[in-house]
């Protein structure tokens, strides 16, 4: 089911987001130590931030800001935080994100509609081939989203091709959630052990962590290598801990879908200036 707001025209979506933006700014002024300081230092009057275009009046918050002021981004008392997740730390120290009950509900909604976008339906069985522990937000998000959707889940975790294939043959999942390059190892293992993977129950994979499309939305070499061997649907998805939102491909395989009820998305250049489509 497509959320109603996502079927509105651009003007209606902008009006919807502008209203939520004003509420968000007011919330930050009331609850965020970091943004209280930032708005004061930049002489930002919250009454002047009414539209997405007005965000240009506020300087960009970058990853270094979050790393250096991590605790000042928390907007609730510690006892309201139910789960702690961190970024991978590939570009420096990991950043901690504390999730409240409402945050977990939002995370579940985000993945539910993202899975629906990829064609997953209530009653389908999905094999989760990523970790759900080690402070990894995505694994938890997938579990919560599938549960909210009403789909079944086989929690296998990362790696271990023998266990992955045992689970596929034993439980017959329709979809996998996996890092695409690992699918090549799955194929190699199947071929070495006479597993008829081409006629398995698997119809599609929601692929995380690696690109499946070029800038022109053509399949990458990785996607081609997988599908030359295994004729299954490969849905690309992009997300980050900072956004707590996903951009997942539908059955048109032409790029991820933006969910305007969850996040305002802006693409900027190296000077942090907005750029037009295609730039």
Task: List each model region and its residues.
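Active-site glycine/GP-rich loop and adjacent strand/helix microenvironment
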Residues: 1-12, 16-27, 33, 149-279
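Nucleotide 5′-phosphate-binding alpha/beta core
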Residues: 1-86, 92-109, 113, 117
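Short, flexible active-site-adjacent loop segments at beta-strand->alpha-helix junctions, enriched
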Residues: 91, 132, 211
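AMP-binding/adenylate-forming
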Residues: 101-114, 125-185
């Amino acid at each position: 089911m497509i959320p109603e707001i996502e079927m509105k025209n651009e003007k209606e979506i902008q009006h919807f987001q502008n209203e939520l933006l004003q509420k968000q700014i007011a919330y930050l002024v009331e609850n965020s130590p970091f943004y209280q300081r930032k708005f004061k230092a930049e002489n930002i009057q919250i009454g002047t931030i009414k539209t997405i275009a007005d965000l240009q009046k506020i300087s960009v918050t970058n990853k270094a800001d979050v790393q250096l002021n991590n605790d000042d981004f928390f907007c609730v008392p510690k006892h309201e935080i139910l789960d702690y997740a961190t970024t991978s730390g590939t570009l420096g120290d990991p950043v901690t994100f504390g999730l409240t009950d409402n945050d977990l509900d939002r995370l579940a909604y985000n993945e539910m509609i993202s899975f629906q976008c990829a064609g997953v339906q209530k009653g389908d069985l999905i094999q989760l081939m990523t970790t759900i522990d080690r402070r990894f937000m995505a694994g938890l998000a997938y579990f919560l989203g599938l549960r909210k959707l009403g789909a079944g889940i086989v929690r296998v975790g990362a790696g271990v091709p023998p266990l992955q294939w045992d689970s596929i043959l034993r439980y017959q999942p329709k979809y996998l959630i996996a890092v695409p390059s690992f699918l090549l190892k799955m194929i190699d293992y199947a071929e070495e052990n006479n597993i008829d993977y081409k006629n398995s129950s698997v119809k599609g994979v929601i692929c995380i962590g690696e690109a499946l499309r070029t800038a022109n939305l053509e399949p990458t070499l990785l996607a081609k290598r997988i599908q030359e061997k295994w004729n299954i649907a490969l849905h690309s998805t992009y997300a980050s801990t900072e956004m707590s939102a996903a951009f997942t491909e539908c059955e048109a395989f032409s790029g991820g879908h933006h969910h305007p009820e969850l996040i305002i998305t802006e693409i900027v250049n190296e000077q942090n200036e907005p750029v037009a489509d295609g730039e």
